Amino acid sequence: MVASAPLATDATANPQRGSYWITTFGCQMNKADSERMAGILEAMGYREASAELDADLVLYNTCTIRDNAEQKVYSYLGRQAQRKRSNPNLILVVAGCVAQQEGESLLRRVPELDLVMGPQHANRLETLLLQVDSGQQVVATEDHHILEDITTARRDSSICGWVNVIYGCNERCTYCVVPSVRGKEQSRLPQAIKLEMEGLAAQGYKEITLLGQNIDAYGRDLPGITPEGRRQHTLTDLLHHVHDVEGIERIRFATSHPRYFTERLIDACADLPKLCEHFHIPFQSGDNDVLQAMARGYTVERYRRIIDRIRERMPDASLSADVIVAFPGETDAQYRRTLDLIEEIGFDQVNTAAYSPRPNTPAANWDNQLPEEVKVERLREINALVERCARKANARYEGRTEEVLAEGINPKDPSQLMGRTRTNRLTFFSATGADGHANKAGDLVQVRIDAVRSFSLSGSPLPH
C-alpha cells in the first residue's frame, strides 16, 4: 500500500533556484514519474529551461528494459559530466531504473553525479535535493514505501492525464529486470486515485489512463475480503469506483498481464460507457514452451480465450500487444508460431523487440543465446508483418464516423487537430469544419474517416 507523504516545507519554496531539464527514457510509468518530479521542482522554485544545455539542474529518468536505452543514458551523462567540470554548480541527477540497478556504481562511473535515485523515490525528490544542497552526494535506491504525491504534477498534456494506481511488480519473468528495479507491488487506495482524477477533471482533463506495471494485479496488497470471498480491491472494482468522476469522458488502463485478465474485468469494460474499447495485453510469444521458459504463467490457448471474450462483448475493440523474438533457445518453428498468432488475431498494433539480456535475470545466464544476425532478421520480418496487420486493421475505418478526442494541434500542419478514437487510433482532421465551426483541444469531435495509413487515420469533422 502506498504511504502518505509529509507536507512540503516553506524552506523549499525558493524562486532563485534556477532552471531544470528532464529527459525521459522508456515507458509510460517513467513519463508519469517525470511529470510528478517536474511538479516537485516547480513547487521548489525551479522553472523549465528552454534547452538542456541552459539548465541549472539536469535529470535523466532512465530505463533499463533494453540495453540500447541504457547505453543512450551513459552517452547523455558523458556530455553533462564534461559540462559540470567547467560549471560545478550544475546539479546532475539520474533517476529511474538504471539508477536503481546501478546504485553507487554510477557514482564511480560518473563521479560528477549529485543524486542517484530509484523509481520508488520519485516523490522524495525534494528531500533528496535538500541533501544535495547541503553538500552531499546522494544515493537513494533502498526499498521504500512509495509516498502519495501531494505536489501537482507538471503534465505534458492538458487534455489526457496519467494516474498511477499500482507501482512495482511481483512477477518473475525470466527476461525482465522490472521487479528488481521497481520493487514489489504497492497499490494506491481507491479514494486517493479518485481524488486525483477529480482534481484533473476540475482542471479540464477529459481522458485518464490508469497506469501500472502489472495493472491487473491492483489491490492484491490491500486488505479486505468481500462477503462473496474474493478480494475487496481489484482493478474491476476500481474501474467501477472511479467511473462516475464528473468531467472525465474516457478511461483507459495499461499494462495488463494475461494471467490476471479476468472475464469479470472484460464485462466491466463492456458495461461501463467511459471505458475505451482498446486493450494492450502483451503475449510475448506464440509458443507455449517459450512462454514456459519465460515464466509467463499462461498458455497461448488462455490468451486466445481472453481475446475471444473481448471480441464477443466488444466486437470493434482494438488490440495491441508486446512480443519478444529470438528469446534464448527459440527455434524457427517456435518463432513461426508467434508470426501465426499475430496474423490469426489481427492485432491493431504490436510493440516488438529482439531479446536483450538484462543484468540479474535468469535468462541472461543461459547458454542458448541466439546470434545477433538471427535477432536482426526475425525482428525485421515480424515488423513487416505487424505493419501489414496494422494497415489491414485500419482499413476497416475508411468511410466510418468516429468520435475523436482532440488533444492538440498537428505539429506538422497547424490547420489540423490531432487526437485519438476510443479505439486508440491516432487521427488527424481539420480544425475548422465545413460549417465554419472551430474545433479545439478537449472537444469530442465526430470525424468522418477519409484516408487510412498503417498507424494513423485522417478525416473531416462533421457539421455540428
UniProtKB/Swiss-Prot annotation:
Entry's transmembrane regions: none
Pfam family name, one: TRAM
Organism of provenance: Synechococcus sp. (strain CC9605)
Domain Radical SAM core: 155-392
Main location: cytoplasm
Protein name according to UniProt: tRNA-2-methylthio-N(6)-dimethylallyladenosine synthase
Protein family membership: Belongs to the methylthiotransferase family. MiaB subfamily.
Enzyme Commission code: 2.8.4.3
Native organism taxonomy: Bacteria, Bacillati, Cyanobacteriota, Cyanophyceae, Synechococcales
MTTase N-terminal domain ranges (all copies): 18-134
Subunit structure: Monomer.
Domain TRAM stretches: 395-463
Cofactor names: [4Fe-4S] cluster
InterPro entries the record matches: Elp3/MiaA/NifB-like_rSAM (IPR006638), Methylthiotransferase (IPR005839), Methylthiotransferase_CS (IPR020612), Methylthiotransferase_N (IPR013848), Methylthiotransferase_N_sf (IPR038135), MiaB_methiolase (IPR006463), rSAM (IPR007197), rSAM_horseshoe (IPR023404)
Function: Catalyzes the methylthiolation of N6-(dimethylallyl)adenosine (i(6)A), leading to the formation of 2-methylthio-N6-(dimethylallyl)adenosine (ms(2)i(6)A) at position 37 in tRNAs that read codons beginning with uridine.
Residues the record lists as binding [4Fe-4S] cluster 2: 169, 173, 176
Listed PROSITE patterns: MTTASE_N (PS51449), MTTASE_RADICAL (PS01278), RADICAL_SAM (PS51918), TRAM (PS50926)
HAMAP family per the UniProt record, alphabetical: tRNA_metthiotr_MiaB
Alphabetically ordered keywords of this record: 4Fe-4S, Cytoplasm, Iron, Iron-sulfur, Metal-binding, S-adenosyl-L-methionine, Transferase, tRNA processing
Cofactor binding comment, as recorded: Binds 2 [4Fe-4S] clusters. One cluster is coordinated with 3 cysteines and an exchangeable S-adenosyl-L-methionine.
Record-level Gene Ontology MF annotations: 4 iron, 4 sulfur cluster binding; metal ion binding; methylthiotransferase activity
GO biological process: tRNA methylthiolation
SMART domains: Elp3
Compartments where found: Cytoplasm
GO cellular component, one term: cytoplasm
SUPFAM superfamilies to which the protein is assigned, alphabetical: Radical SAM enzymes
